Amino acid sequence: MSQDVLTLAQDLISRESVTPLDEGCQQLMADRLSAKGFDIESMVFDDTTNMWARRGNSGPLFCFAGHTDVVPVGDLNRWHTPPFDPVVIDGYLHGRGAADMKGSLAAMLVATERFVEKHPDHNGSIAFLITSDEEGPFINGTTRVIDTLEARNEKITWALVGEPSSTHKLGDIVKNGRRGSLTGNLTVNGIQGHVAYPHLADNPIHNAAPALDELARMKWDNGNEFFPPTSFQIANINGGTGASNVIPGSLEVMFNFRYSTEVTAEELIKRVLNILDAHGLDYDISWTFNGLPFLTGEGPLLDATRDAIKQVTGTDTDPQTSGGTSDGRFIAPTGAHVIELGPVNATIHKVNECVKVADLEQLALCYEVILEKLLC
């Protein structure tokens, strides 16, 4: 088996690029892409490093998308090996970012190098959109690059995001869409007082409880063939001074919707406000839009991805929309078709993160076949 993917993955993992740091990962990729005829554009916004690399000027435009930043390592004492000293043990590459997603970055780059060597006059264009702000607040990363591309009418036709989509074996699941995400920060106002004199106070916890119960029990929609029903979850709740004899003056609640294409964020907000008002609450609320739902249906990208996985691994992939958000949510609204295909996600964000070495080589082959099916 070729060592190209493994060697590059190890080089990337060895760079301690905890979000929003990049630590030279993008420059390493840029140097290799430049040697294959890519024009490199670095886009730095505040503390975030982004790279837009493109080969070709015509359409259709196929884009590999991913991130060089990783999450913090956590308790070092729980790691069997140093997280930024990548090592292969029993066929698995260990290190922070091995699965999420430096292994995918290595597979993308090597697949592209091989493809360009075989097909120097390929149809259309190939691009890389790489950020160091996917694991962080996602303010200055992919979303800013997309804004720049949109401003100059540079349109992505197909985007393949290298997020670890697989569950049990490589390619068993791809993501052809994601649910929308909407977060609410609610403050219910009351009057602080002594618990022995409740008539002189106004308990916001007691007041809010029926409304929160109604929100938690609400059936927001029925979902559809592509998306499960919309989910409402209370993520954080805080009220009180810590003393047993004080009625709190306020209650803070953070909740999140993961919503389907059957409902809009505006509809969810309206329904929440109606419930809060119906219970007569004195409240303040703010909203954070984390991403719209998107879906890539049948078409060239999904067909090429499905066929490539079958050809390389023998697996019949299952397109799904479950799980969290990804940077695909910033690309899809431009009209691009978006698919996520990456390694097994069993150890992502955990101590002792690892990925099967053989999967990285197969992933590179999948990416190469997808390029061939779309641009040859």
From Swiss-Prot:
The first-level EC class reads hydrolase
A Pfam family cross-referenced in the UniProt record is Peptidase_M20
EC numbers on record = 3.5.1.18
By sequence similarity, the record places it as follows: Belongs to the peptidase M20A family. DapE subfamily.
Q: Which reaction does it catalyse?
A: N-succinyl-(2S,6S)-2,6-diaminopimelate + H2O = (2S,6S)-2,6-diaminopimelate + succinate
- Cofactors, names only: Zn(2+); Co(2+)
Q: Which PROSITE patterns match?
A: ARGE_DAPE_CPG2_2
Q: Which domain of life is it from?
A: Bacteria
Q: How does it assemble?
A: Homodimer.
Query: Binding of Zn(2+) 2: at which residues?
Result: 100, 135, 349
- Hydrolase is among the record's keywords: yes
Cofactor-binding details, from the entry = Binds 2 Zn(2+) or Co(2+) ions per subunit.
Q: In the UniProt record, does the keyword Zinc-finger occur?
A: no
**Protein name, entry field:** Succinyl-diaminopimelate desuccinylase
Matching entries from InterPro entries are given as:
ArgE/DapE_CS, Bact_exopeptidase_dim_dom, DapE_proteobac, Peptidase_M20, Peptidase_M20_dimer, Peptidase_M20A
In this protein, the active site sits at 69, 134 (proton acceptor)
Task: Output the Gene Ontology terms for molecular function.
Answer: acetylornithine deacetylase activity; cobalt ion binding; succinyl-diaminopimelate desuccinylase activity; zinc ion binding
Spell out the PANTHER family in the cross-references. ACETYLORNITHINE DEACETYLASE (PTHR43808), N-ACETYL-L-CITRULLINE DEACETYLASE (PTHR43808:SF31)
Source organism (scientific name): Shewanella sediminis (strain HAW-EB3)
Q: Where does Zn(2+) 1 bind?
A: 67, 100, 163
Q: Which pathway, per its entry?
A: Amino-acid biosynthesis; L-lysine biosynthesis via DAP pathway; LL-2,6-diaminopimelate from (S)-tetrahydrodipicolinate (succinylase route): step 3/3
- Gene3D superfamilies attached here? Zn peptidases
